[in-house]
Structures are given as C-alpha cells and as structure tokens.
Amino acid sequence: EGATTTFNGNGGPRIGNIFSRLIYSIKFGSDQILFSDRVNADSQILYDRSPKERVAKVAPYLPLDGRVYPAVVDGRVKWIGDGYTTSSNYPYSQKTDLAEATQDSTTISSQTVQGLTDKEVNYMRNSVKATVDAYDGSVDLYTWDDSDPVLKAWQSIFPGQYHPMSEISGDLMAHMRYPEGMFKVQRQLLAKYHVTSASQFFSGEDFWQTPVDPTESKSEQSRDVLQPPYYL
C-alpha cells in the first residue's frame, strides 16, 4: 500500500472554497479541481515549481546562472543558485555576449543547465546567492558582494529583500561554490587578456582557446561545441 502525506507548507493560493475551485477549474480546464474529493479546505495551487522561476519572480531584474544545485542545509533540501548584477555601460571595457560566452556542450545537450541571457555586458559581478526551499518553495536572497554599487541601488529600491551575508549559516556556506556562468565568461576574456605585451596582443599571439568537448560526437565537434568547466 502506498504511503501518503499532507503538504503543510505555504506554497500557493488556497482553493478550499467553491468559488476558487470554480475559477481554477476554468483556468486550467480541469473539472477534477471542481469535483475531486481530494481537493479540500486546505488545498493549494503551487505555481512556478522550477527554482529558477521562483527566484525570477522575486527578483526579475537579476540575471540568473544557468545551473542551480540541491544541497541538504540545516536538515532541509535547498536549491542554491547565483544571481548577477550586470551593465553594458562600464567605461573603456569590452562588451561580451553572455549567451555566446556561456554556451557549451552542457547547455546544448542538457535540459537542466542553460546559458545566460542573450545580452551584451561589460560589467558583471556575482553579487547575490539565492536559495529555494525544495519543500515549500520559499526564496531567500543573500548579498554576496556588499561593495557592488549596482546591488546597493537595487537594495535601496527594494529594502528588506536581501539578507546580509552574515546570516548565511555555516551549513549553507559549506555548499557555496564558484558560479559556472561567470567562470565561462572569464575564461573567454582571459583567453586574450592574459597577454601583457601590447605587440603580442595586437598581433594575436599567444591567445588561448577553449577546447572542443572530446566526448561529443564528430558532428558536434565539427560545430566547435566547447568543453564545459567542471567541479573537482
């Protein structure tokens, strides 16, 4: 016999009364919401089940890293992600296409890892860490770079939205890692800007190149699908 459980979180609007059930039955085109005996006074509709979607609803102005990962934090499963502050108006700085810089074999073949948004920037900082509770979907945003002026501007617009870094528990801190999307952008830029000689730089000498993923098929390798970074 299968085990059952009752959701005790506060994850969405309640549909216990007949009017709410009727409205949502029409919205989703499902008569089960209206007539099923499994829908009771405590039932809820849970929207935006993806961790990235939930963070984007809370902070739509933050570009989010393409990978979120689960961890057991203080006895609860949390999805952890990275938020960036960006700008395209930083003086005397080359612009980088985020979508192009973060595309590799994982973003092409995986359904869970995505590249960054399609925009050109010349300023990028990993200023925010986000967690999403896997049970009730609650979102917490933490400041990761207190000196970032762009984040300070957002904090002044939305006071109280962010927890200070000091509130990150030791258990959560142990699971923090370097953001994958930022690493991809940095490796593309460092391929050229590690050169310190002006003559070598302008002649294109000693530039590095991210390798093609050797585990991909020959057709994918012919398209120069790049090897992704990985954690040790």
Which ranges hold each PLM region?
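Soluble extracytoplasmic regions of secretory-pathway and membrane proteins
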Residues: 1-232
